[in-house]
């Protein structure tokens, strides 16, 4: 579950960066 959360987090924070 943590992996999934991290994946989603990176997906939305990547563009932000």
Curated annotation (Swiss-Prot):
Protein name per Swiss-Prot or TrEMBL: trp operon leader peptide
Biological role stated in the UniProt entry: This protein is involved in control of the biosynthesis of tryptophan.
Keywords attached to this entry: Amino-acid biosynthesis, Aromatic amino acid biosynthesis, Leader peptide, Tryptophan biosynthesis
GO aspect biological process, one term: L-tryptophan biosynthetic process
Domain of life, per lineage: Bacteria
């Amino acid at each position: 579950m943590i992996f999934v959360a991290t994946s989603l987090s990176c997906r939305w924070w990547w563009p932000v960066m």
